[in-house]
Every structure is written in structure tokens, then in C-alpha cells.
């Protein structure tokens, strides 16, 4: 059996140092990846805000609010840009704040609901509180557009798109210009 080569203290020191440099560079790279992920989420949040401003421009309420009250309900991934506040092209401010899923006054407090991740029971509860009130409903997840929400975002790919639920739009109490359906076919780049 051949004997293993013995490492001199200087060789051992160099190899240990090389391993440490490699480990530190890997850890530093992980931080860069985290920064890239944060930047990507921030870009998508900003793109979501722009898509929503576009949708708002096609919607009319029976009594136009001076300030649009946007309620963010449930855990969300891309609502940070919304919560900072926005201004529509016509100069109307959009005030956004988080509201509890079980708040029975959502229909009177909100002109717009931005719905995050909620279970089916919570979703039904939200839409019961909106019944009879002119509230625009937008879901952050495109998979939930068949039940309740008027518009559902698809944020997963390189572009943000949305779907429109015509049945929910017809029953909502708000008027949505038909051109928004053309907007639904266009894509917004984050």
C-alpha cells in the first residue's frame, strides 16, 4: 500500500487559505443572488403597479372617488409598489393599505381589492363583503380568475399579463371600458 504524501505546513496553509477564499466568494455570490432576487421582485412590483394603473384608467365607479382606496387583502408578493401609493395619469391619488380578510366592511372601505393568497373560505368571505358594492377586484394569482375576481394577474413569466372575468365584471357595479380587453392581450415588461 503506497503511503500518502505528507503536507508541509506551508502547503497546508495555502490549501486552507484557498478553501477559505473559495468559501467567502461563494457566500458573497449568494448575497449577490439574493440582491438579484430582491431587484427582480422590486421590478415586478413596479410593473404590477403600472398594470394596475392601466386597468384603473378603464374603470368608472357610479360615484367617482376623489382618492381611490385600494385595499390589499391577504399575503401578497408584489404589493409593495402599491402600498407606497400611486397617482393615476389624471392626477387622482391611489391610497393603498392592508386590510384583514375577515373585515366585513371591505365593500364600503375599498374602491379596489388587490387579493393575495387566500384559501377558498377566505375568498368567499371577501366576495360576500363586496356583494352589492361597486368594487374592482384584482387577484395577484392568475389561477384564481374563474371564481370572483374581475382581473387576475399572471406575474410568473418574463412579462406581466392579466385575464378578465367577464361574468364578475358584469356583476361588479363598476363600468369597465371594453378596450381593457385589448389591454389584457398586451403584455407589460417588468
Swiss-Prot record:
Q: Which InterPro entries match?
A: YfiR/HmsC-like (IPR025293)
- Summarize what gene deletion causes: Deletion of the gene results in the generation of a small colony variant (SCV) morphology in PAO1. Mutant exhibits slow growth, reduced motility, a highly aggregative and wrinkled colony morphology, strong attachment to surfaces and strong, exopolysaccharide-dependent resistance to macrophage phagocytosis. The deletion mutant, although suffering from a tremendous growth disadvantage, shows characteristic persistence behavior under antibiotic selection and during prolonged infection in vivo.
Where does this protein reside within or beyond the cell? Answer: Periplasm
SS bond partners: 71-110, 145-152
A GO-annotated cellular component: periplasmic space
User: Posttranslational modification, per the record?
Assistant: Cys-71 and Cys-110 form a disulfide bond in the oxidized form but maintain their free form in the non-oxidized YfiR structure. The Cys-145-Cys-152 disulfide bond is well formed in both structures. The Cys145-Cys152 disulfide bond, but not Cys-71-Cys-110, plays an important role in maintaining the correct folding of the protein.
Q: Which amino acids does the record list as binding GMP?
A: 60, 175, 177
Report activity regulation: TpbB/YfiN repression is released through an YfiB-dependent sequestration of YfiR to the outer membrane. Binds vitamin B6 (VB6) or L-Trp at the periphery of the dimer, and both VB6 and L-Trp are able to reduce biofilm formation induced by YfiB L43P mutant. However, VB6 or L-Trp alone may have little effects in interrupting the YfiB-YfiR interaction. GMP enhances the binding affinity between YfiB and YfiR.
**Phenotype for residue 110 to S:** Does not affect folding of the protein
Q: Which UniProt keywords apply?
A: Disulfide bond, Periplasm
Which domain of life does the protein's organism represent? Bacteria
Q: What is the protein's known function?
A: Negatively regulates the activity of the diguanylate cyclase TpbB/YfiN, leading to decreased c-di-GMP production. Inhibits TpbB/YfiN allosterically, through a hydrophobic interaction between the C-terminus of YfiR and a conserved region of the periplasmic PAS domain of TpbB/YfiN. Under reducing conditions, may also act as an YfiB-independent sensing device that is able to activate TpbB/YfiN in response to the redox status of the periplasm. Part of the YfiB-TpbB-YfiR (or yfiBNR) system, encoding a tripartite signaling module that modulates intracellular c-di-GMP levels. The system is a key regulator of the small colony variant (SCV) phenotype, and plays an important role in biofilm formation and in vivo persistence. The c-di-GMP produced by TpbB/YfiN stimulates the production of the Pel and Psl exopolysaccharides, which promotes surface attachment, generates an SCV phenotype and confers resistance against phagocytosis.
Subunit (UniProt): Homodimer. Interacts with TpbB/YfiN. Interacts with YfiB. The YfiB-YfiR complex is a 2:2 heterotetramer.
Name the UniProt record assigns to this protein: Negative regulator YfiR
Organism of origin is Pseudomonas aeruginosa (strain ATCC 15692 / DSM 22644 / CIP 104116 / JCM 14847 / LMG 12228 / 1C / PRS 101 / PAO1)
Amino acid at each position: 500500500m503506497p503511503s500518502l504524501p505528507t503536507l508541509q505546513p506551508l502547503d497546508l496553509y495555502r490549501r486552507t487559505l484557498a478553501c477559505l477564499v473559495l468559501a467567502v466568494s461563494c457566500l458573497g455570490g449568494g448575497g449577490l443572488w439574493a440582491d438579484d432576487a430582491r431587484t427582480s421582485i422590486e421590478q415586478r412590483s413596479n410593473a404590477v403597479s403600472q398594470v394596475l394603473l392601466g386597468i384603473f384608467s378603464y374603470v368608472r365607479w357610479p360615484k367617482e372617488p376623489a382618492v381611490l382606496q385600494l385595499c390589499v387583502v391577504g399575503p401578497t408578493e408584489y404589493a409593495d409598489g402599491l402600498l407606497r401609493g400611486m397617482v393615476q395619469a389624471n392626477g387622482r391619488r391611489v391610497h393603498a393599505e392592508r386590510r384583514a380578510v375577515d373585515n366585513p366592511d371591505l365593500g364600503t372601505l375599498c374602491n379596489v381589492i388587490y387579493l393575495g393568497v387566500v384559501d377558498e373560505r377566505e375568498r368567499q368571505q371577501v366576495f360576500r363583503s363586496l356583494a352589492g358594492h361597486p368594487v374592482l377586484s384584482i387577484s395577484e394569482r392568475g389561477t384564481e380568475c374563474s371564481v370572483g375576481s374581475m382581473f387576475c394577474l399572471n406575474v410568473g413569466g418574463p412579462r406581466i399579463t392579466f385575464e378578465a372575468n367577464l361574468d364578475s365584471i358584469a356583476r361588479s357595479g363598476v363600468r369597465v371600458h371594453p378596450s381593457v380587453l385589448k389591454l389584457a392581450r398586451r403584455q407589460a415588461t417588468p
